[in-house]
UniProtKB/Swiss-Prot annotation:
It comes from the Bacteria. This is Glutamine--fructose-6-phosphate aminotransferase [isomerizing]. HAMAP family: GlmS (MF_00164). GO terms for cellular component: cytosol. Its EC number is 2.6.1.16. Residues 288-428, 461-602 form the SIS domain. The keyword Amino-acid biosynthesis does not apply. PROSITE patterns: GATASE_TYPE_2, SIS. It holds the Pfam family GATase_6. The lineage of its organism: Bacteria, Pseudomonadati, Pseudomonadota, Betaproteobacteria, Neisseriales. GO terms for biological process: carbohydrate metabolic process; fructose 6-phosphate metabolic process; protein N-linked glycosylation; UDP-N-acetylglucosamine metabolic process. The active site is at C2 (nucleophile), K607 (for fru-6p isomerization activity).
Length: 612
C-alpha cells in the first residue's frame, strides 16, 4: 500500500534506481507515481497518474538527473486520483517529501499551517508534512534532521517519510512510525525503500528501521540515527536472502500463475523444519517449550487471507491439540472490550509482517496483559516478529501478486506444524500419530503438484464463469475456510461477486440465490462429512443450480448434466485443506484471464495493507 524509494549516490544518477525501484513496488498497489531529484541545486519533480512507465517516460523527456532523490507510488486515501495529489509534495521549492501512512490529525495541522501563511495545492495529508518540515527548517537555520525531528512530534498516526532539501544535496532524512522502511547500503551509495525488493538489484545489505527511528543518510551510509526516545541508536545491517530471480516472471505470464506453481517447493521448504527436526517447540523459539506447557487456550488475530488460514488452524488446534482456540479479525479485535487471559497464546498471522491492523491488535493484546505471543510471518525482520516473543517464518519466498497464493498454503503448513507440536507437548500424540503426521507432511508437495496438474481441466471451466455476475462457494468443516478463500480469490481478481457459506447453512438463506445463472462451487473431499455435502448438492440441483465440484479421487462423484466434477488426489488426511486450495486458486486465475482483468494488480487493492 504505497511504496517509497530514495537514494543518495556519489557517482551515479539516482533516476534509474528510483524508476526501477518503483516498478518493483508496483505489486503493493498504486494509482499514481512520482519522483523528485535535486538537480543542480533545484528540486525537479515529475508526477503522473497511471503506470510508473508513464512517469518514467516523462522524467526522461525532461532530462531529470542528479545524485539524490526520492520516489513514490500512491494508493489514494486522502484526496482523489489526480496529479496534484500524487507524491512527492514540495513546500516552497525547498523541501520535498514522500510519505506512506495516514496523518490522522492532518486537518488541524493544515489549519495551523494555513494560519502561518502556507498555501496548499492538494487534498492530501502528506502536504501537511512537507509544509511542517519546511516551517521547522526555516526556524532552525536549515538543519534538516532537526526539522524532521520537530515536525513529526506533531503528527498522530502511522507514517514512513523520506525528505530532501534544495540546499542539502548530500543529505537524505527518513522517519518511521508504524509503516515499513529500510535503509540499504551500497558502495558510495545509500538507498531507502518500503520493501527490500526495490533495492535487491543494487545491494543486499539492509538495515530495518524501527518505530520512532529518524535517520540522516549520506552516500557513505547512516550518519546519524535516533530512536523513539530521541537517543542515539544503531540498526544491525544484514544480508538479504531475497534473490533477484524470485522477482522476475521467468516463463510465466503473471506472478500469480508463477506463485501458484511455486507452491510445491514453498510448502516443502516450510515443512522442512518439522521434517528435519521433528515437531519440537524449539522450532518456534528458545522459550517455546515453557510457553506451550503453560498456555490454556489460543487466540489468533489476522486479516484477509491470513484470517482464513487462522480459521483452518482452529480445527487442527482443537482436534489435534485439544486446546480451545478463538479466531478474530484483527481490525475488529483492537476496537472492542476484551477479557484478557494471561495464559492464552496470542498468534498473529501476516505474509508481510507489517499489516497495520494485525500489528496494532497484537500491541493491544499485550497492553491487556497477554504474556505470550507467536507470529507466523513470511518476511524476516518485519514488525510482527520483532513484537512477538515467538516466531515461525514461512518459506514462501517473495510473493508479488496481490492475491495471496503460496503465502496462504505455507501458513497452513506452519499452523499444522504448530498444532501437532502443541499436541505433542500436551502428551496427546503417540509415536504412531507423529509418524502419520510426518508422512502426510512429507507427501504434501507431491499431492499439491498432482492438484496443479488439473489446470487444463480447471481452465476449461473458466469460460462458463466469465460472464457470471455472482458465484457461491460451499464447504463443510475444515474445508469451509477453503470455500471462503476461494470466494475471496474470485472476487479479488475477477470482480465477480462471490460468497462462501458452510454447506449446512444453505436452507438458512443462501438457497434463495440459487438458479440457473448462479454457479455453485463445492469443496467435497472424501471425509466424514461427504454424505452431508452430497445432500446439500442435491438441494442446489433441485433448484436448477449449476454445480462445480472439487472432489477427491475416491469420492465417488460422477459428472452429470448440471454437475461438473474435477478430482484432486485421493484424500490426504489432515492436510486436505492445503490440497483443495490449489483448484480454487487456479479457477480464479483462469476466470480472470477469460474476463481480461489485471491479474497481478487488481483494481483498488494493495498487497500490503499498512494503513487503516
Amino acid at each position: 500500500m504505497c511504496g517509497i524509494v530514495g537514494a543518495i549516490r556519489a557517482h551515479h544518477n539516482v533516476v534509474d534506481f528510483l524508476t526501477d525501484g518503483l516498478k518493483r513496488l508496483e505489486y503493493r498497489g498504486y494509482d499514481s507515481s512520482g519522483i523528485a531529484v535535486n538537480t543542480d541545486g533545484k528540486i525537479k519533480r515529475v508526477r503522473r497518474v497511471g503506470r510508473v512507465q508513464l512517469m518514467e517516460d516523462a522524467a526522461r523527456e525532461k532530462g531529470i538527473s542528479g545524485g539524490i532523490g526520492i520516489g513514490h507510488t500512491r494508493w489514494a486515501t486522502h484526496g482523489g486520483v489526480t496529479e496534484p495529489n500524487a507524491h512527492p509534495h514540495i513546500s516552497g521549492g525547498m523541501i520535498a517529501v514522500v510519505h506512506n501512512g495516514i496523518i490522522e490529525n492532518f486537518e488541524s495541522e493544515r489549519k495551523r499551517l494555513e494560519g502561518l501563511g502556507y498555501r496548499f495545492e492538494s487534498q492530501t495529508d502528506t502536504e501537511v508534512i512537507a509544509h511542517s518540515i519546511n516551517h521547522e527548517y526555516a526556524q532552525n537555520g536549515g538543519k534538516l534532521f532537526e526539522a524532521v525531528q520537530e515536525a513529526v512530534k506533531r503528527f498522530h498516526g502511522a507514517y514512513a517519510i523520506a525528505v530532501i532539501a534544495q540546499d542539502k544535496p548530500d543529505e537524505l532524512v527518513v522517519a518511521r512510525m508504524g509503516c515499513p522502511l529500510l535503509v540499504a547500503l551500497g558502495d558510495d551509495e545509500t538507498f531507502i525503500a518500503s520493501d527490500v525488493s526495490a533495492v535487491i538489484a543494487f545491494t543486499r545489505r539492509v538495515a530495518y528501521l524501527e518505530d520512532g527511528d529518524i535517520a540522516l543518510l549520506a552516500s557513505d551510509g547512516i550518519k546519524r540515527l535516533t530512536d523513539k526516545s530521541g537517543l542515539p541508536a544503531e540498526r544491525k545491517v544484514k544480508v538479504s536472502e531475497l534473490s533477484l530471480a524470485s522477482l522476475e516472471l521467468g516463463p510465466y505470464s503473471h506472478f500469480m500463475q508463477k506463485e501458484i506453481h511455486e507452491q510445491p517447493r514453498a510448502i516443502a521448504d516450510t515443512a522442512e523444519v518439522f521434517l528435519d527436526g521433528g515437531f519440537i517447540p524449539e522450532n518456534f523459539g528458545k522459550n517455546a517449550k515453557s510457553v506451550f506447557e503453560s498456555i490454556r487456550s489460543v487466540k489468533i488475530l489476522a486479516c484477509g487471507t491470513s484470517y482464513y488460514a487462522a480459521l483452518t488452524a482452529k480445527y487442527w488446534l482443537e482436534s489435534i491439540a485439544k486446546i480451545p482456540s478463538d479466531v478474530e479479525i484483527a481490525s475488529e479485535y483492537r476496537y472492542r472490550s476484551v477479557i484478557a487471559d494471561p495464559d492464552q497464546l496470542v498468534i498473529t498471522i501476516s505474509q508481510s509482517g507489517e499489516t497495520l491492523d494485525t500489528m496494532e491488535a497484537l500491541k493491544y493484546a499485550k497492553s491487556l496483559g497477554h504474556r505470550h505471543s507467536l507470529s507466523i510471518c513470511n518476511v524476516m525482520e518485519s514488525a510482527l516478529p520483532r513484537e512477538s516473543s515467538l516466531v515461525l517464518y514461512t518459506r514462501a519466498g517473495a510473493e508479488i501478486g496481490v492475491a495471496s497464493t503460496k503465502a496462504f498454503t505455507t501458513q497452513l503448513v506452519a499452523l499444522f506444524g504448530l498444532a501437532v507440536t502443541l499436541a505433542k507437548v500436551r502428551g496427546l500424540v503417540s509415536e504412531e500419530d507423529e509418524a502419520r503426521y510426518t508422512e502426510e507432511l512429507r507427501q504434501l508437495p507431491g499431492s499439491v503438484q498432482h492438484a496443479l496438474n488439473l489446470e487444463p481441466q480447471i481452465a476449461a471451466w473458466a469460460q462458463q464463469f466469465a460472464k457470471k455476475t455472482s458465484a457461491l462457494f460451499l464447504g463443510r468443516g475444515i474445508h469451509y475456510p477453503i470455500a471462503l478463500e476461494g470466494a475471496l480469490k474470485l472476487k479479488e481478481i475477477t470482480y465477480i461477486h462471490a460468497e462462501a457459506y458452510p454447506a449446512g447453512e444453505l436452507k438458512h438463506g443462501p438457497l434463495a440465490l440459487v438458479d440457473e445463472n448462479m454457479p455453485v462451487v463445492v469443496i467435497a473431499p472424501n471425509d466424514s462429512l461427504l454424505d452431508k455435502v452430497k445432500a446439500n448438492m442435491q438441494e442446489v440441483g433441485a433448484r436448477g443450480g449449476e454445480l462445480f465440484v472439487f472432489a477427491d479421487l475416491d469420492s465417488n462423484f460422477n459428472a452429470t448434466e448440471g454437475v461438473h466434477v474435477i478430482r484432486a488426489p485421493r484424500h490426504v488426511g489432515e492436510l486436505s485443506p492445503v490440497v483443495h486450495t490449489i483448484p480454487v486458486q487456479l479457477l480464479s486465475y483462469h476466470v480472470a484471464l477469460a474476463r481480461g482483468t489485471d491479474v497481478d494488480k487488481p483494481r483498488n487493492l494493495a498487497k500490503s495493507v499498512t494503513v487503516e
